[in-house]
Amino acid sequence: MDTDIGSRTWHAHAKINLALHVTGRRADGYHLIDSLAVFTRFGDRVEIALADSDDFTVSGRYAPAVPLDAGNLVLKARDALRREAGSGRTPPVSIKLEKNLPIASGVGGGSSDAAAVLRGLAQTWALDIDDAGLARIGLSLGADVPMCLAAKPLVARGIGDELSMVPDFSALGLVLVNPGTPVSTADVFAALSRRDNEPLPPLPRSIDFHSLRNWLEVTRNDLEPAALALQPAIGRALSWLNKAGSGFSRMSGSGATCFGLFETGNVAKRAAAEIRSRQPDWFVAATRSMSSEAE
């Protein structure tokens, strides 16, 4: 473990649901899903350092919307790991969150922030805890946190906690667009007309831009129709992605962030610049996804 007491920064990658089928609902109300997800290089950043007392500050474009109380997932992650390890091994820390991802936007920003804090504090505190231990703590914080800890192409099933890594998955050129309309995940799930859809079809044996695009054409995001009914601006975001030349466009998660798939990173950058020039108040980011290889 790295025991450097100086500050270090961890990336909190955006989670993009390329496809998301809702396949059932448990007795406790949790929905069952079957989803292919990737994680982008663009996201939030978490800086951690040992300190005289616990401190939490937020900067970045979306900082004003971030709660600073104990309900924040960053602080929940800190406190959960401290309870697990014991206060004697977990001295005070300063946590600085750079919030670059929109709030309530369907890209797992809060869950990814929590995952970054768990990874970062495990190293800062030099804890003897493995990935499975962190995932167990992460699941107690939210169903998306374990997959955000993995941060590689994966298929998530169950409530999002049954994870299967996808090998030989190359990085993708992506453009993310959010029209500035927060969407309540609970409201989207409550508005679903059907909760017993079929699971995802088998993935192609060899995944490249073309095979993935063809596969995506026969999949869905089952949350998209409900989210569109709640926030019609999502349709405008998808329209702009298509106008900019996206090879495939869809809403991620429960929205309102949408993604466009592009064959190269340079094409994605040009498309993002075009959309940004027409919609300067929207969140628009060109990025690449993390591949299945170690990065």
Swiss-Prot record:
Q: Which GO terms describe its molecular function?
A: 4-(cytidine 5'-diphospho)-2-C-methyl-D-erythritol kinase activity; ATP binding
Provide the coiled-coil residue spans. Answer: none
Q: What is its EC number?
A: 2.7.1.148
Keywords of the record, alphabetical order, are: ATP-binding, Isoprene biosynthesis, Kinase, Nucleotide-binding, Transferase
What does the entry give for GO biological process? Answer: isopentenyl diphosphate biosynthetic process, methylerythritol 4-phosphate pathway; terpenoid biosynthetic process
Question: Record keywords: ATP-binding included?
Answer: yes
Annotated ATP binding lies at: 102-112
Domain of life, per the record? Bacteria
Q: Which InterPro entries match?
A: GHMP_kinase_C_dom, GHMP_kinase_C_sf, GHMP_kinase_N_dom, IspE, Ribosomal_Su5_D2-typ_SF, Ribsml_uS5_D2-typ_fold_subgr
Q: Which reaction does it catalyse?
A: 4-CDP-2-C-methyl-D-erythritol + ATP = 4-CDP-2-C-methyl-D-erythritol 2-phosphate + ADP + H(+)
> What stretches pass through the bilayer?
none
Q: What class of enzyme is it?
A: transferase
SUPFAM superfamilies, A to Z: GHMP Kinase, C-terminal domain, Ribosomal protein S5 domain 2-like
Task: Identify the Gene3D superfamilies for this entry.
Answer: 3.30.230.10, GHMP kinase, C-terminal domain
What family is this protein classified in? Belongs to the GHMP kinase family. IspE subfamily.
Q: How is this protein named in the record?
A: 4-diphosphocytidyl-2-C-methyl-D-erythritol kinase
The species is: Mesorhizobium japonicum (strain LMG 29417 / CECT 9101 / MAFF 303099) (Mesorhizobium loti (strain MAFF 303099))
